[in-house]
Every structure is written in structure tokens, then in C-alpha cells.
Amino acid sequence: MTTNFPAFPPELLQGCRNALIDYMKIQAGNQVVILNELGSAVDPFVVHCLATVIQEIGADPHILWTSKLAKGWWQELSPVVRAAIGHADVVVQNISSIGKTHMLDLMLEKKVRRFRNYASDFATMTSDWARFPVEVQDYLERKVNTMLIEAGTYRVVSDDGTDISGEISKRLTAWRRDLKRSGGMNVSFPPSVFRASESLNANGVMMVYSTYPWGARRVGLPEIRFQNPVKLVVENNYVVHIEGGWEAELYRKLFEEQAAAIGQRSYYVDSWHSGASPRAFVPFDPRVDPDRFDHLAHNHECWFHFHLGGLSNKEGSKTQIVEHINAVCMNPTVYLGGQKVWEKGHLTIWNEPELREIASKYGDPNVMFAPRPIWE
């Protein structure tokens, strides 16, 4: 039997099939736009494999290359690109500068399903992270997201001095009602972050080790990691004091710049979340591409971070407000409703017998759930 499909390494095919069939659940007849940004870490060989798997499913791939957005969140997406997305059933977005912000209205109004793909390079798409079984990930997300909905309160503590407690808002928006991401309208891959939980009435201290690289370089902060943590004091859900080494003064500038756009809301503790994978990794020195480092590291279970500003102030189908500052608190212990759910950056659920039994169908749970170092 002959085939017109080119030969791909089995690990690459497994990763792409896991992505598009198991996680995104693309169906025969779907019109699928594969969106790529020129000059980003997108391997055309991986794109070709994704398109081949889409054809294998019986769907129609349409590969589109466009320019990076130099101003990121603050720049509009090309109307040509938006038109292509608006006529698709699914957009497979090989992530770089374009975000959900630029297409949220298309997702909500035209029901375009978005697949946010971080595995756009060969090393990531062939990794155990990209080949992680969806059945195991679904179990994890259902369990933790149910806890997040039902908990009511949270507390985040760390050995370096973070200790902050607050309430979890019960408000659920259209794009975060599902208990799992697979098959949904906004799927992140490989296993990515838990959806952000909105904070209320928080009080305490955060020790912050990094922020978004694209924000850091605007004011002269280290793009990857601060030399000295910045201490934020929070009262009634607002940052009221910023202190630390030389980084503290520059970090304060981010709040001041943001306040020019959204006022006092700049200091508001909007929400928080972490990655959901112990196997997330960065296949290069972070200094090579700090933005991509942040995109990938964001998905690790130890990468716990707060959004400070106006991220969750959304209404209806309008594009979300994107004015927020990232505050990364590494390897914390997190309690939901008094129950320990993360311990020093590692999810406690990995020890549950039922989850381990499911995982044993695919491999050794001790290997699958072992945290890969991402911050040393």
C-alpha cells in the first residue's frame, strides 16, 4: 500500500496526533487554520506534520504565516488573519506574540475553537510532555478545577517568605466553565496552565522572582529572573507596599505605567494560577529567547504566579483587557479551602491511587509524574 503522506519520526507523529486528535478532538470536515508567526520558534517540519495529521483525520488544513506583533497585546491583529480565523472551525495557533486577546471575539461570536500550541519545535513536540496521555490530564484537571470552584479560600506560602491568603471569586466566565481543556473552545498544549482563579479580599506578602520578559525589558528589569526577590505587601486585595533590592524600584515603574491606563486597578490582585505539568521544560538556554522561555516555563506546576491589574475585567464578547503585571512566586505550598493541593511546587494529586492506576496503563507513574527541574 502506498501513501502520499511523507515519513515523519514516530515520536513526532505521536505528539501531533496526541495534540490534534486526543486533546483538540478535531473532526473530519473541520476547516483548520494553522497560524504561524515569521521569525518565531516554529519548525516548518512540525507544521507539515500537524497539517498531515489534520488531513489524516479528514479535516482541511490551511497554513498561514504572518508577522510577529511588535507591540504584543497592544497591537491589533491583521484583518486578513482575523478573516481567515473567522471562517475556520479551529485555529491551531503556534504561540508567539499573538494571544487569545486578539481573537476572543471570534471565539465567542463565531464559535472558532482555539488550539494554543507551545510545541511548535521538534524537541518539544517529541517530548514526554507533548505525549502525555489525555486521560491522565483530564482526570487531573477535573479534580483540581473542581477544588478551585468549590474551595472558597486560598493560601499561598513559601520558604522564602510568601504568605498570602484570600477568597476565590465564584464568577465563571464563558471561556473557563469547563472542568477540563481537552475538546473545549480554548485548548492549550502540551498540558498547560490551570485557568486563572480570581482573587478577593487577599492579605499578606508575595515574594516575586520574575515577571513577563516583555514587561521587564521596558523598564530595565532582568528578563528571566530577578537577582533579589521583590516583596509585595497586599491589603484588601491591593498591593500597598513594594520593597527589595534595586529591582523593586523598577518593578514599581511597571505599576506606575499601568496606572496611567487603568488607574488604581493597576495595584489590584486580579487572579492567580500555575502550570499543570511536572514535565514541562525549556529545550534551550533561557537567554536565547526569554519570551519563549516564559511561555514554556509558564506551564510547569511549580510556576505559580499572580496577575496584578485588570486581566479579568471582561464583559460579554469584547476583547479582554490585557493591562496586568505578572508576579511569579516559585515552588509554593498552596491550600484550597484548607486542603494542601501543591507542596513546594508539586501537585499532591499525583499521589492519588486512582490517578496512578490510570497512569499505569501508559507507563510508570513515578517517571510520568516526576517533576522536571525548570528553575535552578
Task: Describe these PLM feature segments.
Residues M1-P229, E235, Y268, L336-K340, ...:
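Active-site bordering "gate/hinge" segments
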